[in-house]
């Protein structure tokens, strides 16, 4: 369909191709009356609503139809009387035109345009239009009923219906004489309608402002079309819903007779629809009259009822009434939300004052490693308690044997067999059956005399790093010579040959109250006061790991941070030697080539790993895992990393070698050379305390940096071993054996007080 520009004021009339009348029943023309329809006939509107149009719609249809007829008369188109309401077409944009009459009663024939007229006078067309509008206002009423119209509308229809009788001489109907007498017609009141212009003037005079007539009446016709289409959609949905309900009911109750649903007729639905629209336009107005000047006619039809309601809500043009309950406002509306909350708080039982509250003691929080280190640094060094006998013995150890008070009273009455027995017990590391028998006989001979024993220094206190292997070899050989002695004393002698340093803090030594200390088999019994706590040497692993860090280090110890800096400087120097190879140098400098293997290139899909030590990109094959201290502990010496920082694979491979040696018979230890013994000791090499390595993180380092770190650690630990050896030798020279023979030739002897 081709649409014209405007409705009444003058524009080209639109032409239409009539495809049939609209929906006579809401369900019959559901597809035809969809969103694609642009025009509805007045007869379709009346049939759909099943009630007459209101007065404002009648004013609008009359004004818009006369406007289109006036525009057609200027183009000298033939006139035609309006025979039925089906010829009046209301368009979507608010225009109203006349269609030619249908030959048949059912549907109109196809016509070239909207305005196809035969020769007829203008007054006849106005008269027929007035009659059709009156029938639309009287639609649905009985013959004996008549609708009461407002005086202006009744006068307009009366003038339009009596136009032919009032002016029978004007047969041509041209507007030449009308245009010449235009000023006089504007001054005097229109007593008779002779042209379309007179009808339009009467319609415009109905409004408060005549200049708003075109826009207002166009808006009314546009609203009429929109509301009619919405009603049709509403009725179509209701009918489809009823059909679906019937189908569901038939499926559920197939055996029973189908009962018809109680339906509301279309007329009832249309009546309800009209009532809702009327209430929205007239009755429900959520706005104050005092806020703006109320202009009922031009504004009411500019928007649909829904748009009007939403506009009033957005602009807050409403006043809410106070809801009264039993003649009074409800309590919850009297107070604000803040006051209600305060009243609720006041209604609760009073709270206890803060001073009267007794909170539970906070649970003890486990101290972190950092706090424990700081506490040990701030605390004074605690010395372990020693018995008076040990103090006396340490004093005797500071002078030669000849100056000792115990050996000055040398009145030896002990047989030679006792001395040999003590020597053999010292070599084998345990008491034999002869010692037990001899001790029993001695106690029987002298029951009243109490046995006071002096303890000679053990081999573990005198041997150095070089003499330890020889002593072990000697003890194992002696154990193999005398098969009657058990093999356990040799293990105990080896495990107890190291003494903890005498200046260890008491927190690092185990408490002797927890378990009974084992009696040393190579020492002679002595009595100690019961109120003096005995010192229990720690286990081999803990004593060795702590002993390493207690002796003063007299060599240069590089820290982790310094080694990292040295490695980064070496890497930069290594990069400079590739300057003559521009491609390799550029790729290495930009991080597009692995710095270790220099064969793997990195692309968008192949990412590189960054070595945390030298800060250079490496590939996955050259990247290894290594545990390193974090930033606060980067000042630790590099030798403190030890084997624990190396990769798990290497440490496990290294541990497999000595693990087999531990399961071999003890007698085969004597067959090892010094090289195999050093390999066994490397597995038991001293490590950094595990409690200080809890927060070390596993970092990614390249194979070159890992090798570099391992070499520095091994060299630093060799220097540390030499320093520890010198420290041990310096301490052990302060012994009362000033001119003792070599460790391989020395055999200690112990004598009791009674023997002296």
Curated annotation (Swiss-Prot):
Residues 425-447, 529-538 have a biased composition (Polar residues). Residues 512-528 have a biased composition (Basic and acidic residues). The modification Phosphothreonine is found at residue 509. The modification N-acetylalanine is found at residue 2. Keywords: Acetylation, Actin-binding, Cell membrane, Coiled coil, Cytoplasm, Cytoplasmic vesicle, Cytoskeleton, Host-virus interaction, Immunity, Innate immunity, Membrane, Phosphoprotein, Protein transport, Repeat, Transport. Residues 40-231 form the KIND domain. Pfam families: KIND. It is a peripheral membrane protein. Residues 474-492 have a biased composition (Low complexity). Residues 556-576 are annotated as: Spir-box. Residues 1-35, 425-538 are annotated as: Disordered. The keyword Protein transport applies. GO terms for molecular function: actin binding; microtubule binding. Acts as an actin nucleation factor, remains associated with the slow-growing pointed end of the new filament. Involved in intracellular vesicle transport along actin fibers, providing a novel link between actin cytoskeleton dynamics and intracellular transport. Required for asymmetric spindle positioning and asymmetric cell division during meiosis. Required for normal formation of the cleavage furrow and for polar body extrusion during female germ cell meiosis. Belongs to the spire family. Interacts with FMN2. (Microbial infection) Interacts (via C-terminus) with vaccinia virus protein K7/OPG41; this interaction prevents innate immune signaling activation. This is Protein spire homolog 1. It comes from Homo sapiens.
């Amino acid at each position: 369909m081709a649409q014209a520009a405007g409705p009444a004021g003058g524009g080209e009339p639109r032409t239409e191709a009539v495809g049939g009348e609209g929906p006579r029943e809401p369900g019959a023309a559901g597809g035809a009356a969809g969103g694609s329809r642009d025009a509805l006939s007045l007869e379709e509107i009346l049939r759909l609503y099943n009630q007459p149009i209101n007065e404002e719609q009648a004013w609008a249809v009359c004004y818009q139809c006369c406007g289109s007829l006036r525009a057609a008369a200027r183009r000298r188109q033939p006139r035609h009387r309006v025979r039925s309401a089906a010829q009046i077409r209301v368009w979507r944009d608010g225009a109203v035109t006349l269609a030619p009459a249908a030959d048949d009663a059912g549907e109109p024939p196809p016509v070239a345009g909207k305005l196809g007229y035969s020769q007829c006078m203008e007054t006849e067309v106005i008269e027929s239009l007035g009659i059709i509008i009156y029938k639309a206002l009287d639609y649905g009423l009985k013959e004996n009923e008549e609708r009461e119209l407002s005086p202006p509308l009744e006068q307009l229809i009366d003038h339009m219906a009596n136009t032919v009788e009032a002016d029978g001489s004007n047969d041509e109907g041209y507007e030449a004489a009308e245009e010449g007498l235009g000023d006089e017609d504007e001054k005097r009141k229109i007593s008779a309608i002779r042209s379309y212009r007179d009808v339009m003037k009467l319609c415009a005079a109905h409004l408060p402002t005549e200049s708003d007539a075109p826009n207002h009446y166009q808006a009314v016709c546009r609203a009429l079309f929109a509301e009619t289409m919405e009603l049709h959609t509403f009725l179509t949905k209701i009918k489809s819903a009823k059909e679906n309900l019937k189908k569901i009911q038939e499926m559920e109750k197939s055996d029973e007779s189908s009962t018809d649903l109680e339906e509301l007729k279309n007329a009832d639905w249309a009546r309800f629809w009209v009532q809702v629209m009327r209430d929205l336009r007239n009755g429900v107005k959520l706005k104050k009259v005092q806020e703006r000047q109320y202009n009922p006619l031009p504004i009411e039809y500019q928007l649909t009822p829904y748009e009007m309601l939403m506009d009033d809500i957005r602009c807050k043009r409403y006043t809410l009434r106070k809801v009264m309950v039993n003649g009074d406002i409800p309590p919850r509306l009297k107070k604000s939300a803040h006051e209600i909350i305060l009243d609720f708080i006041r209604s609760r039982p009073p709270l206890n004052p803060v001073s009267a509250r007794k909170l539970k003691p906070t649970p003890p929080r486990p101290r972190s490693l950092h706090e424990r280190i700081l506490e040990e640094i701030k605390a004074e060094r605690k010395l372990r308690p020693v018995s008076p006998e040990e103090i006396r013995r340490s004093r005797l150890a500071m002078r030669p044997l000849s100056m000792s008070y115990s050996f000055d009273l040398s009145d030896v009455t002990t047989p030679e067999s006792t001395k040999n027995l003590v020597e053999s017990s010292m070599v084998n590391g345990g008491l034999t059956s002869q010692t037990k028998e001899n001790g029993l006989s001695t106690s029987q001979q002298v029951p009243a005399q109490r046995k006071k024993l002096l303890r000679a220094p053990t081999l573990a206190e005198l041997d150095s790093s070089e003499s330890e292997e020889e002593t072990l070899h000697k003890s194992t050989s002696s154990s193999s010579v005398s098969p009657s002695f058990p093999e356990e004393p040799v293990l105990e002698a080896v495990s107890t040959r190291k003494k903890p340093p005498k200046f260890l803090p008491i927190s690092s030594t185990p408490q002797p109250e927890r378990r009974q200390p084992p009696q040393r088999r190579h020492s002679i019994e002595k009595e100690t006061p019961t109120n003096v706590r005995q010192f229990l040497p720690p286990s081999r692993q803990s004593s060795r790991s702590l002993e390493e860090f207690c002796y003063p280090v007299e060599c240069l110890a590089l820290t982790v941070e310094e080694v990292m800096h040295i490695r980064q400087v070496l890497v930069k120097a290594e990069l400079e030697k590739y300057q003559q190879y521009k491609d390799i140098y550029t790729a290495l400098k930009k991080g597009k080539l692995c710095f270790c293997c220099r064969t793997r290139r990195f692309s968008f899909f192949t990412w590189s790993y960054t070595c945390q030590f030298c800060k250079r990109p490496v590939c996955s094959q050259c990247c290894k895992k290594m545990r390193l201290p974090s930033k606060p502990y980067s000042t630790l010496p590099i030798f403190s990393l030890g084997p624990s920082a190396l990769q798990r694979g290497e440490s496990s491979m290294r541990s497999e070698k000595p693990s087999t040696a531990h399961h071999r018979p003890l007698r085969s230890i004597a067959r090892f050379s010094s090289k195999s013994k050093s390999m066994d000791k490397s597995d038991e090499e001293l490590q950094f305390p595990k409690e200080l390595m809890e927060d070390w993180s596993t970092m990614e380092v390249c194979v070159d940096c890992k090798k570099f770190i391992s070499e520095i650690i091994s060299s630093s630990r060799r220097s540390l071993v030499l320093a520890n050896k010198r420290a041990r030798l310096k301490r052990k020279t302060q012994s009362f054996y000033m001119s003792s023979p070599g460790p391989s030739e020395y055999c200690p002897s112990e004598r009791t007080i009674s023997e002296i």
